[in-house]
Regions:
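Short, structured segments at the rim of ligand-binding sites
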Residues: 1-445
Length: 445
């Protein structure tokens, strides 16, 4: 793959079927829940990417048998009821936020052992302190670098009690604590210090815990007190655990017809979904796309002869992984796009708000930045720009979709993506799938 990678525009309306990879969020949660359970669980339709490989390798280092079959998209985990067999381990979490937070809490469950965890430089800047404080309040012994990675855990199990947690910077901090709480020595109550956490991902975690045998958690009406179940062992969710297609990855291909006109079909993306990002389809319907979901999958269409899609003003807090998708295609929308509720994305793989503003301005757009929002006023797109990706997979994929617009009208590339292999974090085959969609669309016209 060349770097920068020129994006070849579509010269015909999109007409293609794209098979999405499995959900990263579900795959990594399911691997941990399978390890917490007794017996073997096989994930069907699992994601194979850097983030899931990191989780699988970490579980192996902790003594679990993990068998991967990428050709069949299956991952088998032989659980042990949460017992960590290794007396010590060094775990590398890369830039995988799910693995980083979930494994930290998991290692604290062990009655004894020493576990060292570290990641790449970007991971060393991502929020961890609130989770570490909560785990220490439950009896964990953790050495950290001022509340950040690297970490050393001297395991001695977790006791019960009430802890405070700020999950506004990342709901993964709360999800990590929820999944291990049933195996603490006493009941755990979690008091949230701020209601502004992403409840959709927490709901996913709680629903998956129920699928693996836990009773429902008790949640106060204001959402600020969560009491996970206690005393019930996890059990396998069945011989096969189906993993949904990734709804965040779907956002790129759902947006493609808005850029190129035409129709994209996404088999297997059907409701109801565990993933909050499935709601991105509703946003596309509001800009003028036709989105239909059946038990077989989801189809998104935008008429070639229709006027430009309409801009949107909306709060993306609940589906913030998809805000980059809308922002990247906003130059092609009619009117001013305003996206709010995204302050927490400043502490993800990069400062996603400032980085998005910078790249749109390089493309000639009028962009206003606020602490929690951006406003995009379309201007003529500037050609021959190589998009910086900031080590962030979602920048590569979002702007890859914008590059499918035939800006010059002759099918020649006008936009390139620097470091396109960053997509390996969650969707290694993204650019291959995008190019195949272009070829299929050309052939069917």
């Amino acid at each position: 793959m060349t770097d920068p990678l020129p994006i070849v525009p579509f010269t015909r309306p999109a007409r293609a079927t794209v098979r999405l990879p499995g959900s990263k969020s579900i795959t990594n949660r399911a691997m941990l829940l399978a390890a917490l359970s007794g017996g073997s669980t096989t994930l069907q339709g699992a994601l194979f990417s850097e983030d899931t490989a990191i989780m699988a390798e970490a579980l192996r280092r902790l003594g679990f048998a993990v068998t991967e079959d990428e050709a069949r998209a299956t991952i088998r985990v032989d659980g042990s009821g949460g017992a960590i067999r290794a007396a010590s381990a060094e775990l590398f979490v890369g830039l995988a936020g799910t693995a980083a937070r979930f494994l930290t809490a998991f290692c604290c469950l062990a009655p004894r052992g020493r576990f060292a965890l570290d990641g790449v430089e970007q991971m060393r800047r991502r929020p961890m302190k609130s989770l570490l404080d909560a785990l220490e309040a439950l009896g964990a012994s953790i050495q950290s670098s001022g509340g950040f990675f690297p970490l050393v855990i001297d395991a001695r199990g977790l006791r019960g009690g009430e802890v405070s947690l700020d999950a506004t910077e990342s709901s993964q901090l709360l999800s990590a604590l929820l999944m291990v709480a049933p195996l603490a020595s006493g009941p755990v109550s979690i008091r949230l210090t701020d209601p502004g956490y992403r409840r959709e991902y927490v709901t996913m975690t709680l629903r998956m815990m129920e699928q693996f045998g836990q009773p429902p958690a008790r949640i106060s009406a204001d959402g600020l007190l969560v009491q996970p179940p206690h005393g019930t062992p996890y059990r396998g969710a069945g011989a096969l655990y189906p993993v949904e297609p990734d709804a965040s990855a779907a956002s790129y291909f759902l947006a493609l017809p808005v850029v190129t006109r035409g129709t994209i079909e996404l088999p297997g993306l059907s409701g109801p979904s565990l993933q909050g990002d499935a709601a991105f389809a509703d946003r596309l319907a509001r800009v003028g796309a036709r989105v239909s979901t059946t038990p077989a999958g989801t189809t998104c269409s935008f008429d070639r002869g229709a006027a430009r899609a309409q801009a949107l003003r909306d709060d993306f807090h609940a589906i913030s992984d998809t805000f980059l998708t809308l922002a990247a295609v906003a130059p092609l929308l009619e009117g001013e796009t305003h996206i709010s509720g995204i302050a927490h994305t400043r502490k993800q793989e990069t400062d996603r708000v400032s980085a998005m503003v910078a790249e749109l301005r390089r493309l000639g757009q009028d962009v206003h930045e606020e602490p929690d929002a951006i406003t995009i006023r379309p201007r003529p797109l500037r050609a021959d720009v190589a998009i910086e990706t900031y080590g962030d997979h979602r920048f590569a994929m979002s702007f890859g979709i914008l590059g499918c617009h035939d800006l010059r009208g002759d099918g020649t590339p006008w936009l390139a993506i620097r470091h396109p292999k960053v997509c390996a974090k969650t969707f290694p085959g993204f650019f291959t799938a995008l190019e195949q969609a272009r070829l299929d669309s050309t052939a069917s016209s």
